[in-house]
A protein has these predicted regions:
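Second-shell loop/turn segments in exported
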Residues: 74-82, 117-125, 144-148, 156-160, ...
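Conserved active-site loop region of the serine DD-peptidase/beta-lactamase
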Residues: 226-274
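A short, well-structured edge-of-sheet supersecondary motif
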Residues: 84-119, 291-292, 301
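Short glycine/serine- and small hydrophobic-enriched flexible loop segments
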Residues: 136-144, 223-230, 323, 327
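Structured C-terminal helix/loop/strand segments within mature extracytoplasmic catalytic/sensor domains
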Residues: 1-64, 80-92, 232-250, 282-330
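Mid-domain, small-residue-enriched loop/turn segments at the edges of structured enzyme/sensor domains
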Residues: 102, 175-232
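Active-site SXXK
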Residues: 113, 123-148, 161, 301
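Active-site-proximal beta-strand/loop segments in catalytic clefts of secreted hydrolases
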Residues: 108-110, 162-166, 173-177, 191, ...
Length: 330
């Protein structure tokens, strides 16, 4: 565990890495305010909370999208003009050169099958985007023919974990699916090759749930997202649509990140993560992954950022980068 945490420390110490954006053919989420701070053992204070706080009373009572409704099919998105230019471009490189921290990102165009990567560096801590991995593992484990196979309890916990980023729900499901070993097995089937599930949930010297120290790369997060938006050998259609419906119903306060600059009419399914590394409020891991479809665009985007001096700073960085990508993907 100390090795994993140590790796996070090394990552967080860096400045913006050399920016490299490359295109390759073939296979490989409107910004908002930061999450609320809630009291409780798994709901850290505003000064240092993992990106998965338990919902505030108002949020816990908000209406949710009906679970029987299907998320729109990614393949049904407007075709538009297939983009051929680098979605990051000089503007992204110029912007990030003046920002603190290390940013890694990837974009996958579902219209063309082309992908681009930005930044260089080792895998970074997932924080609460690992909850998407937990959800997909759960769906793969429970799949029953063409259905999700989820129990009422599974659905309640999954909704809390994705829509409200609830830590307790995530911990319950982490154990329910079999922990790191089963998640690692699912990841191998899903094509993730650079993701290492955390070996502990209660980690020595770390105040928050240890699953947030799972490390990953933007490329692996694109592979995980593709399991939801393209025909998958590991997830039936009902499971994919269910996961996307949760990601589209994320509480408004957490709809920042890859949704930055995206018009309200566009479909955005996302999961974000925020984690104060080393128990301080000056070294934040801020991540965002998701699917954006509409306005002539249909793409996946994953952003990892570490070494942020504050939570909001990291959110602002990803919002701005996402807005650039949205414009250039048109």
């Amino acid at each position: 565990m100390l090795a994993v945490l140590g790796a996070c420390a090394v990552i967080a110490g860096g400045t913006v890495a050399g920016l490299a954006a490359t295109g390759s053919a073939g296979p490989a989420g409107t910004g908002g305010a930061p999450a609320r701070a809630i009291s409780g053992t798994s709901d850290p204070s505003a000064a240092a909370r993992l990106n998965a706080t338990s919902p505030a009373p108002a949020s816990s009572q908000r209406s949710r999208s009906p679970r029987s409704s299907s998320a729109p099919s990614p393949r049904a998105a407007p075709a538009g003009k297939a983009g051929h230019r680098d979605p990051f471009g000089p503007a992204a490189a110029s912007y990030l050169s003046g920002r603190a921290g290390t940013v890694l990102a990837a974009v996958y165009d579902l219209r063309t099958g082309r992908s681009w990567h930005l930044g260089q560096g080792p895998p970074q801590a997932e924080a609460s985007i690992v909850k998407l991995d937990v959800l997909e593992t759960l769906l793969a484990e429970r799949a029953d023919g063409d259905g999700t196979g989820l129990s009422a309890s599974d659905r309640t916990l999954a909704g809390q974990m994705i829509e409200d980023s609830d830590n307790d729900a995530a911990t319950s499901l982490w154990y329910a699916v079999g922990g790191a070993a089963r998640i690692r097995s699912f990841n191998a089937r899903a094509g993730l090759t650079h993701t290492a599930p955390s070996s502990c949930v209660i980690c020595p010297g770390f105040a928050w749930p240890g699953w947030g120290l799972t490390t990953t790369t933007p490329g692996d997060q694109i592979a995980l997202l593709r399991q939801l938006v393209t025909p998958s050998s590991v997830l039936p259609r009902a499971a994919r649509e269910y996961a996307l419906s949760l990601m589209q119903d994320v509480t408004p306060a957490q709809r920042w990140g890859v949704s930055g600059g995206v018009p309200a009419r566009v479909t955005v399914a996302l999961k974000n993560g925020w984690l104060p590394l080393h128990g301080t409020d000056s070294d934040w891991q801020i991540n965002s992954v998701g699917w954006i479809s509409g306005g002539g665009r249909n793409y996946l985007m994953a952003v990892l950022s570490t070494g942020n001096p504050s939570e909001q700073y990291g959110i602002d960085t990803i919002d701005e980068l996402a807005a650039t990508v949205w414009q250039r993907m048109g």
